[in-house]
Each structure stands twice: as structure tokens, then as C-alpha cells.
Amino acid sequence: MTETLLELINVPRNHVLSTIHNYLTKMTSNYEPIRRLPNMQDAGPSELAQRDNAVTKLRSVFGLRGYDRAETPILEQTELYLRKSGGTLSSRLYGFTEPGGYEVSLRPEFTAAILRQTIDNMTDSNAVRIMYDGPVFRYARPEDEDGLKTRQFTQLGAELIGPSSSDADGEIIAMSLEGLNCLEIADTRVVVGHVGVIAKALEAFDLSERAKLFLIANISELKKGGTNSVLEKAATFGFLPDTAVADLETPDNRTQIEKKIDRVLSDGIIGPFGQNIGPRTVEDIVSRLSKKLSETDDPDNFKKALQMLSAITQINGNANNALQNAKNVLSESGLDPAIISSCADVISSAQVEGVPIEQINIDFGLARGITYYTGMIFDIYSNENNSKSHQTLGGGGRYDGLTRALGYDYDFPSLGFAYNLDALVACQGPDTNSASNTYFVSPENCGSVQAAVSEASELRAAGKRAAVQYKNNGATSSSVQSEGESR
């Protein structure tokens, strides 16, 4: 039919084919190579071999402590991560609407999904020990503080579900350090904080739940010395003077407050201490705020709590000194220094597990972007790694209230931690023992392709890596030998 058509329009066949070829060549030459997405990384054979080796060793360490593997979907309903996750994490989700109509996100972490899976399948009250590993995804804008971090990385971690005692806290801390030891990562330390101590201290000031959660959510800001900025936020949300009600009725002031709330929302700050705002506008929030300001917390108590929290978040150092300094701050604030005992118990339990006290620091200003932690929290470092990049190798904590946040009608004691596996591998440095031991069998040396295939098969049957080295653009034997042994 093609020939008939060409005859009808009286155009030489070769001319038509040449024109089509030239057009296609021109069209395809305009294509740009498709590059990786920003802050996404490829992993080649040597990197994967080193990562797999680390995973195998860590699974062995965890397995010897009774932990079993579990997997969860990479894709989950977005609501799983929004509930009690805090503004920081929710603003970093890779979320979209899937064809079935569900709002879904690539997982940014494992904990919530592992807990959901465990609770749904639990048959008795015994402790459940789970380990996991896999990719997680967290978006960061280039202008953000961590905007240059890889947006996909591998987490490997463990969850201990059931025990509520500080003994379990000690187990998790000790195991996190054992993992680093098995990878021969030297000069490691653990930095421990305690959200539970902070929460218990705040109870003494007779504050509303909103006020306490607000203060806890701003620990990181207070640690940096940002007391004034926290006071400004507090005034915006009605935690300070009663005159705020009148201020809201003044058009100019109302406009300014709306702008502040809009900025706070865009920064992802409201999530940790408020309910999900859903489709409500800034105007809706301001209107609701004006109705609630008459129920505001006592400003003097709020300021005293803020002063205490500002002081205790500055405490950071070796465990014994930090505990004593925290007791002093509590006493000076008119609080019972025994409040600190729950943190001291965690340190003692870690020592029972074999962690030297010299390896433990306490930082009461340690904060988390994921706000479901309710007790001890910790980060783990290699001192050498920390001095270069100021990034943790991993961390975790206790999150006894997460089950209720996920929609269950009870709290369930749970704790865990996760490594950034890519950071662990980077901390190890290049693997000098990962050179290929593949035998490349040359058909020229064997006399024929069939003979080379047969010899390669015999080598593989003996448990050796072997491949036939076919000719490829005139590759020389010397280039082959650089990759492995040539036969």
C-alpha cells in the first residue's frame, strides 16, 4: 500500500524516507538528557554492596536481641503521617491523590506504620520486638536549613512495643550503640533528652494542654535563645494578656494578627499543638481565637513556665552534671527536683545494659520535628562524623501516646529508634575490600564461545563469580583485567 501511495503522489520513495529520517533526527536531537531529580542519588554496585553488608550485620545484632523483621507499604494514607506528626514533617511529605481517590504519601518514616501493623495483629500482651529497613522520602526546599539533604534515604531501625519501664529505654539506647560498634564506627556517643520530664515540670504551672504543647513545640527555638520570638507567637495565639481580645476587635491589629498567623501556618508551626486545621482559613482561625481568648491561661504562670523552660533547655553536657544542673533549675523555679528522676532512671538502665556513663550526654533542649514522643528521646553520633557534618547517625525515643493519635481508644507503651543507613555507610568510608572477584572467560583464549560458556559454568558451579568476556568496541585485555581476573 505504501508503494501505491508513493506512486499516486508521484514522489520518489527514497526522497520520502530521507525526509522522514531527517525530521526524526532533528526532532530527537532537540531532546535534553533526563537528569536525576534534585537531591536524589543513584547508588552503584560498590555502594550497594557496602550498604547490603551493613544491613546484614545490623540485622544480626538486632536478631540476637530477639527482634524480627517486618515490612510496611511505601505508600500509605497521608492521614497516618499527619496525626500528631507536627508541622515540620507534614510539610515535607510527597503526597498526592491516587487513582482510587485516597490522599496518599510516600512514607517519610516507619514508626507510625509499624505500630499500626503491630497493634492490628497483636494476639497477646507480650512485648513485640520489630526491626525494619527501607527507603523513606522527605522533601526539603532548597532554601530550608536542611535543603541540601538527600530527599530519599534508607532507614534501618527497631521498635519495642509493650514495655513501659525505663529498662526498655536502656535496651534501645544500648542496641543503637551496639549497631555502630558492629560496623566499627568509632568514638560514638548518645545524647539523651526527655520530653516526659519537660511535660511533668510544666504541669506545676496549671497551664492548659494547648499551652503546654505550645511550649514543648518551641523547645528548639528556646534552646537557640529565641525567647522573644516564642513570646510573640504566644501572643499571636492568645496565651498572653487579656487585652488580646480587644486587640482583635481593632481592624488594623486584626489584620496584623492575620498576617502573623498566616506566616506561622506557612512555617508549619501550628501542627504540633493544635488540631488539624483542615480547610479553615486564617480568618476562621482568628474568629475562633477571639472566642477562646477569654479562657486564656494565666499570663504570669505562662511566663514563669517559659522562663523555667528557657533555662532548662540550655542544659547540655555529661550526664551527671546535666542531671544536677536540671535539679537546680527546677528548685529555683519552685518545683520538685525529683521530677528529674525519670531521666536519671533511663541513664541508669543504659548503664546496666553496658553503656559507659562517659558515652552519654544529656541535652534537655533536644527537640524533634516529629512530635509524638512522650518520654526519653535520643540522638546517636560518631564524634568524628559530628565534627564534620553536624548530623546525627540516627535517633529515637518513647511514644506511648501514638496509638491513641492513630485512632485507637487506648495508649500503648512503645519506643524505638532508626539509623540513617546512608549516613552510617558514609561514616565508614570507602570499602577497600569491595573489588570484584569475577573471572572473565575469553572466547579467544578458550577457542570458541561454546568453550568459554562451558568454562564459566564450571567456575560458577564451584561457587565463583564468572562471566564470558565478549568483544565490546575493541576493548583490550588490559581493561578487562582491571575489573577482575581474565582467563
Where are the model-predicted features located?
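Short secondary-structure boundary/hinge segments and terminal tails
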Residues: 79-80, 198, 220, 477
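Positively charged, Gly/Ser-enriched RNA/tRNA-binding surfaces
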Residues: 28-29, 47-65, 76-79, 111-186, ...
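TRNA-binding/sensing appendages of the translation machinery
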Residues: 2-16, 20-112, 151, 165, ...
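Electropositive, surface-exposed helix/loop patches at the edges of structured domains
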Residues: 102-123, 223-239
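RNA-interacting cores
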Residues: 32, 192-193, 197, 216-217, ...
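Charged, amphipathic alpha-helical linkers/stalks
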Residues: 199-207
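Cap/lid and interdomain-hinge subdomains that line or gate substrate/regulatory clefts
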Residues: 164, 191, 201, 222, ...
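Acidic, His- and aromatic-enriched active-site or binding-groove loops in soluble protein domains
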Residues: 92-101, 206-236, 382-386
